[in-house]
Amino acid sequence: MSSLRRIGKLGERSSVLFLCDMQEKFRKSIVFFPEIVSVAARMLQAAKKLEMPVIITEQHPKGLGPTVPELGADDLKKYTKTSFSMLTPEVEEELQSIPDLRSIVLCGIETQACIMSTALDLLDKGYDVHVVADACSSRSQVDRLFALSRMRQSGAFLTTSEGVLLQLLGDAKHPKFKEVQKIIMEPAPDSGLLSLFRGPNLFST
């Protein structure tokens, strides 16, 4: 991949949606868990309409349970893992089979663990990484805040679910615009991002 600095443009034919470890055992421990899953489910609905590839992982499912049903991913393959990073050999092999892949759109939990490990591994491989901040969370808002800041320092793009979907569409004339518009017409649920702005500025250089 080119070493030139990228500006982070997204394209539906060059992007993959990653959904990380949204499992039953995390339901009571992750802050804003229902809201995070709701936003991730919106991302998944849109990805299906846009025919984007989707990678879903489960961390040690025998201990942490299956992916929660409200994500709407029952019909999709789950990649099991024990590593924090989603970039297992099996997932990496799947990515290599996707032509012209440039960007990964990343959602899930926990921000300071599996999300950050995945983002750093993907960046190291030369991919553009777009972290959907309103679809990522942790047990602690402090960990969430500093993990988002850390990923940005390393070159990931911090964004929102609606921002990603509109960029993927690119034009109101897109043949799937009206279908995706229905998904984003109702604002995404509050996942606690505004409370993070009392801490370190995520956008400082």
Swiss-Prot record:
Pfam families, A to Z: Isochorismatase
GO cellular component, as recorded: cytoplasm
What CDD domains has UniProt attached to this entry?
YcaC_related
Tell me the domain of life: Eukaryota
Write down the SUPFAM superfamilies for this protein, in alphabetical order: Isochorismatase-like hydrolases
Q: Which family does it belong to?
A: Belongs to the isochorismatase family.
Q: What is this protein called?
A: Isochorismatase domain-containing protein 2
- Originating organism: Xenopus laevis (African clawed frog)
Gene name tied to this protein: isoc2
